[in-house]
Amino acid sequence: MNSLLIAATDTDAGKTVVTTGLVAYWQKYYPSKALGLMKLMQTGQGDREWYEGLFQGQLEMITPLQYQAPLAPPVAADLEGRDIPLGTVWQALLNLQKSQDLVLIEGLGGLGCPVTHELTLADLAAQWRLKTLLVVPVKLGAISQTVANIALAEQKKVNLGGIILNCLEPRTETEIEQLTPIDLIQSLTNCPVLGVFPFIEDRRDLDKLASVVASWPEIKLSSI
């Protein structure tokens, strides 16, 4: 299946900047191949304007479900008296997969984030057989959050492709090693750390974003 879910350990982990980097990488190194981007569902203010302004029509992007309140989807939907029709999301994904060589799916919250009253993002990733990258912010507490999210992923049988460490602020190599020690995380989770995304002040610098992703030797988007 030609799809990759970008999930995270929590909200504000940097999924959008990592996803932007993956888009920039794909467009730079695989310009002849079509790329689609899907926001699984959006609550509150979204990133659609960000992506559209940055890639200016070069990217097929869809957001099947949107809710106004910046809350967990079932809570936001309840406030509006609406349902969460996952069938609509699934059909939108199938349609995008048919027309694109690769579809990047930006998730929401952590893998334990509820997408309905019964299902979490991890449930959805497993049921829809989505290969998943886990974005981990470089900060205090990241190790325990990573272990917990991957334990949930294993319980739900999510196809985890690996971990991306993301710097939300400028970090030295020593800080990265102390806050998110790669060997320790890999030992505790049996999940590979594929790369580190450094803090980039200008998130519109697509060449720099693409070069970061290109420096991760284990990332092979063309083989998904």
UniProtKB/Swiss-Prot annotation:
GO cellular component, one term: cytosol
EC number(s) recorded for this UniProt protein: 6.3.3.3
GO molecular function, one term: dethiobiotin synthase activity
Protein known as: ATP-dependent dethiobiotin synthetase BioD
Family: Belongs to the dethiobiotin synthetase family.
Subunit annotation: Homodimer.
Record: residues binding ATP: 12-17, 47, 106-109, 166-167, 198-200
Group of enzyme by EC: ligase
Localization in the cell: Cytoplasm
Main function: Catalyzes a mechanistically unusual reaction, the ATP-dependent insertion of CO2 between the N7 and N8 nitrogen atoms of 7,8-diaminopelargonic acid (DAPA, also called 7,8-diammoniononanoate) to form a ureido ring. This cyanobacterium does not encode bioA (which catalyzes the formation of the precursor for this reaction in the cannonical pathway), instead it encodes bioU, which replaces bioA and also performs the first half of the cannonical BioD reaction. Thus in this organism BioD has a different substrate.
